[in-house]
Structures are given as C-alpha cells and as structure tokens.
Amino acid sequence: MMDDDTELRTDGNSLLKAVWLGRLRLTRLLLEGGAYINESNDKGETALMVACITKHVDQQSISKSKMVKYLLDNRADPNIQDKSGKTALIHACIRRAGGEVVSLLLENGADPSLEDRTGASALVYAINADDKDALKHLLDACKAKGKEVIIITTDKSSSGTKTTKQYLNVPPSPKVEDRQSPPLCTTPSDVELKTSGLASPPSEKDDDFFILQTGHQSGCSTSKVLNEPGSPTRKVSSLKRARLPQLKRLQSEPWGLIAPSVLAAATRQDETHGTSTDNEVIRSINDVTFPKRGPLSRTNSIDSKDPTLFPTVQEQVLKVSASTPASWKAAYEKGQAPHPRLARRGTLPLDQEKSGMCPPGPSTLKDPASLKLLENDLYDLDIQPVGDPPNSMSLESGKGPLDRKKLNSSHLSLFHGSRESLEVVPSTSPTSVRRRPPHLLERRGSGTLLLDRIAHTRPGFLPPLNVNLNPPIPDIRASSKPASPLASGLKSMAPVAPNSPKRVDLRSKKKLLRRHSMQIEQMKQLSDFEEIMA
C-alpha cells in the first residue's frame, strides 16, 4: 500500500521520488540542476512534506532528519500547506517522525499554531499520536513565544458519557475520579461536612450532599476533625442542609459550591428565628423608634440668630419709627396730599402686597390711605413724564413697613438677582441722584432685585457674597437727598436735617443704572417740568 501511495504522491516528479527514497546525492544533483525545491504534486505535498512522511529504508537511504535538514538548508518553506491544510510539521507529528525532525522544523520557522481544514494543529496531532517527545518540543516552542498551551480532548468513558482529560506535560489519568488532585492542606471552607448514618434519617440519600474532596479526607488534621461522627454541630447543619434542595450541586460543577460558613449562618438564623411568627416580626418593626428630624432652618435667615445678641431689623425699625418726631409725621401727611396716583406696575398681586405689609408701627401709618400710598411708592418703579416718586420725607417716615416689606421679599433677590444687578456704577448726573432713592426696587427682565441696604449693612449680620463687605452704615433717622423735583419743592413744609456731602457721594456711587428708555420729547418735557418746579 505504501508503494501505491508513493507512486501517486510522486506523480512523476523526480525530486519527490528522490526524497521519498532517501537519496541525498540525487536530491542534491536535482537541486543544483535547477529543480524547484517547493514544487508539489497534485495533493499539494512538497519535498519537505514527503521527507517527513516517508518510511522507506534501504542501504543507500539516509536518515529522515538528515534529509529534512538538507532541504531546510536549501530554503524549503516549512509553513506551506497542502490541499487538506496540513503542513510539514503536522505530517511529522502524524507519522511520528520523532523529536529531532520536529525540533529542526521549529528552529527553521515552522508555526505550531497553523491548523488544517478540520481545525486541528500540530499539537493536537502530536497528542493523538501519543508522541511525547514531539509534544515536548512543541510546548517549549510555544512557551518561548510567550504562549501558555492547554490542550483538552474529549473521550468517552465506559458509561458513554464524555470525560475531560488534560494533557500538559503529564500523562493522562486513566479514571475520571483521579482528575482532581488533593491539595496539600484543606481549609475549613474547602471541606463539606458529611454525617454518619445515625445523624440523618433513613429517608435521606447519600447523593443529597456534595463532597468537595472525595477520597481525600486525610489532607490535614482539620478535615479529620470535621469528619468525625457524633458532633452535634454537624448533625444540625446536615439536617438543615437536607431541607434546602436548591443547594444541591453536581460533581461536575465545582464552581457552584457555597462556602459552609454561609450555610452555618443560615442555620443559626433558622434556629434563632424559627419560632418567630409574622406578628412578632410586625411587633419588632413597630417597636423600632426612629429619631425625629428637626425642622429645617434657613442658614441665610436672620431669624435663626439669637435675638438677644443680634436684634433684628424689624425691631430696630419699630424702635426708630416709634421715636419719629411729630414734625416729620405732620410733614408726611401734608406731603402725601398733593401727590397724584401714579400708574401701578408692581410684580405682585394686591392681596400679596397687603399681606406682606406689617401693621405694627406708628398710629399715623395705620391710616388706609397712607398704606395705599406707601404701596404705590414701593412698587411704582418706572418714572412717568408727569410725575416722580414721592419725596424722601414720606419714604423716611414710612421706613418701618418698607423695611419689613424688604425682609419679606428678600428671597426674591436671592433667586432672581444676578451679579450684574449688584455691580456698582458711579452716577455723575445730579438728576439721577435726585430721581432714584437708594432703597427702591429695580425692575429687571429676569425678576425683582431688592437692594436692601439697611439689612445688609447692620452690624452683627453676615453680608451677602456679592455685596461690598465694608459699606458705610447709613443713619436711619437721617433723611436722604430728595428723590424727585417734587420733593425739592416741599422743603419749606418740614425741617430736613442737612445731608453730609460725603454720604451723598457714597450713595450716588452705589446707585444702579435705571434701564428706562425715554423719547426726546419726554426728556424735554421732564426738563421743563424740573425748571418750573425749581
């Protein structure tokens, strides 16, 4: 049969014939005469493959290893594959060419990871051929390239089930039970308890438990002690585990193991809480008391401060307004009469404004008409061509409700005020100084900004982050500069304390620019009106 295969393999190729016969001189003459060393037959087999396959031996033939070495020295390619995908290395492993031939092929660049059409490499064929010498050379070559090789083949046991055998420089185990080698010393977490027949009921079967180290109970003293019969702990744990069928594991699934410490914890919980009923559980839950959370307090609120140490602005305003001279009150009543009702352009409804005003104060401020005028003075922000906001005297005498109104709406400035709204813009025009009191609201597109000078500059309170940390403390009892030309015309009606020029300059620097566009005709009318009033 070998002769028939040889005739078919050589296919009239003299080089393949010479190699198969092992004629080294003839092979050298053919190669020196111009024969192609990698020429193949109809199966795709080259001269190097034929040298690995042939078993012809006679008096004139040379050894297989010498022929392979000569072909490799003459630049024969060891990684050429035939039509079935096999290389010269695979053929050498299949035909058991020996470790020397395999070593020569590997040294000259043969790739042990190349696979044929069936997906098997030279490693698989070496294992199937039981060629340990060739397998050793293959493993050494793979480790030299930084590859760890683990080859697993499947065989069938006597019962017909597939068993797994691992070949890694060690002979395969004859039995399935010998696959697991015992460790040097087992730990308590690696040992599964198994009780004697006295501790378990007769109805229980031995397959209810999974023994991790079968046949290796003499690994160390710990496993011996835990496997002694008669221990009450083992009896209880075995009974509890018998009630848990979901903890059964197959012998072929060691990754499904559960540590005995987990089972012991479950056993202790069952012993402790086995007699408790649902009512007891509900009672225990009801008996648990949770600490009550105190009411949330605003860190920015001045009401959270100690009133004995830091009096609030409301109390200070009440004291000042209660001690207001009678001449100021009379001037306020006289000054409110000639003022026309200005257009209402507030941002809050009327009900909220009324609720925001605090009634305590001087008896003069309890008049409904004066409250109405104060509300209009506070929320009428845009200057009309025919009138201006009331004079500083009326605003000064009504500081109590105004400051309380500022405190009630101070949160609006926290949410809607931007850093741009608190920028200090110096005002050089005297009309802007007279037109705008320092404590009025300013209308912005995003909301209402409250410039609360008194609340932010009183000693004992933390100033806001975006306000000057060292502003001058204004005197509440001192009147500011008149806010409008109408107020300048009423100077003769009531005595007004003279203002300090320094204070006027400081307040004028703190003014915010009014975002109000006026036509040229309105500006002319306003200038004419100021000249008439002057």
Swiss-Prot record:
Keywords: ANK repeat, Phosphoprotein, Repeat. Coiled coil: none annotated. The modification Phosphoserine is found at S301, S446. The keyword Repeat applies. PROSITE patterns: ANK_REP_REGION, ANK_REPEAT. Gene3D superfamilies: Ankyrin repeat-containing domain. ANK repeats lie at residues 10-39, 43-80, 84-114, 118-147. The keyword Nucleotide-binding does not apply. Residues 159-205, 332-368, 384-403, 480-503 are annotated as: Disordered. It comes from the Eukaryota. Belongs to the ANKRD34 family. PANTHER family: ANK_REP_REGION DOMAIN-CONTAINING PROTEIN (PTHR24156), ANKYRIN REPEAT DOMAIN 34C (PTHR24156:SF6). This is Ankyrin repeat domain-containing protein 34C. The lineage of its organism: Eukaryota, Metazoa, Chordata, Craniata, Vertebrata.
